């Protein structure tokens, strides 16, 4: 899709949203066509680094012990230690709250079997299974990448809606993020953007603005 048409849709989305007393998110909505999504190879399951970033921090939880847990605490991340992990396995309601409150999870590699048992049933369906790292890992680069990353997982639905920033970002920044996501879709399929039936940009409380093809 043409960069200028994406930019025009971002601008139009702003005009379709009334001012609110909070900062509204901006999403990209994409409808797909002529894809057999019962075939796993046709499904979109991607983590995409946004060129303009997310515009605001995303909550990250680290499941760890020892030095890695201490490092995560120093970085101001949510830390889930082994004993807490075991308790979450017994309390699905609390586990769901934690899953919904965090965009990404990181886990110490040797704790992954326990993670799968305790949190797997909650994180798996949300596409939030943790990124495993060794106990001596430097978390900073991974956290920095996650702070610019969004996830797409269509499963069996021919539609996805994904965050591209918020209204305090510039039109150019938002359009660049939308274009990066559409480029991933284009590279995924042999026929590229032919499989995009329609695409829109939208603020939280506004109507959807179509991206002209």
Swiss-Prot record:
This is Large ribosomal subunit protein uL1. It holds the Pfam family Ribosomal_L1. Keywords: Repressor, Ribonucleoprotein, Ribosomal protein, RNA-binding, rRNA-binding, Translation regulation, tRNA-binding. GO terms for cellular component: large ribosomal subunit. Transmembrane segments: none annotated. GO terms for biological process: regulation of translation; translation. The lineage of its organism: Archaea, Methanobacteriati, Methanobacteriota, Methanomada group, Methanococci. The keyword Repressor applies. InterPro entries: Ribosomal_uL1 (IPR002143), Ribosomal_uL1-like (IPR023674), Ribosomal_uL1/biogenesis (IPR028364), Ribosomal_uL1_3-a/b-sand (IPR016095), Ribosomal_uL1_arc (IPR023669), Ribosomal_uL1_CS (IPR023673). One of its GO terms (molecular function) is structural constituent of ribosome. Part of the 50S ribosomal subunit. HAMAP family: Ribosomal_uL1_A. The keyword Repressor applies. Binds directly to 23S rRNA. Probably involved in E site tRNA release. Belongs to the universal ribosomal protein uL1 family.
